[in-house]
């Protein structure tokens, strides 16, 4: 009997023993420290974009002042311009309130 025919049953058993590849990261909710850890994992040495909440609020207030016409050359928009609901599209809304993928997380890398 040829030597390769003896190896055939062994190869068949080995192929059954090797686990099928699974997705290491499925789309999931990531909040708080889990979100930060996932960003470190995805971005590595590049780091990721982060704006502290206090800084964002200050920038939002400056933007609202400009919309109301308090900034020079703003054109004097009426307060009704602020009545439309603001749409949040940050990483927390994308990955904590909803699910996100590694590909979506990668958009926040530097």
UniProtKB/Swiss-Prot annotation:
Residues 57-87 form a propeptide. Pfam families: Insulin. Residues 1-24 form the signal peptide. One of its GO terms (cellular component) is extracellular space. GO terms for molecular function: hormone activity. Keywords: Carbohydrate metabolism, Cleavage on pair of basic residues, Disulfide bond, Glucose metabolism, Hormone, Secreted, Signal. InterPro entries: Insulin, Insulin-like, Insulin-like_sf, Insulin_CS, Insulin_family. Residues 60-80 are annotated as: Disordered. Disulfide bonds join 31-96, 43-109, 95-100. CDD domains: IlGF_insulin_like. SMART domains: IlGF. It is found in: Secreted. PROSITE patterns: INSULIN. Belongs to the insulin family. Insulin decreases blood glucose concentration. It increases cell permeability to monosaccharides, amino acids and fatty acids. It accelerates glycolysis, the pentose phosphate cycle, and glycogen synthesis in liver. PANTHER family: INSULIN (PTHR11454:SF9), INSULIN/INSULIN GROWTH FACTOR (PTHR11454). Heterodimer of a B chain and an A chain linked by two disulfide bonds. This is Insulin. It comes from Felis catus. The gene is INS.
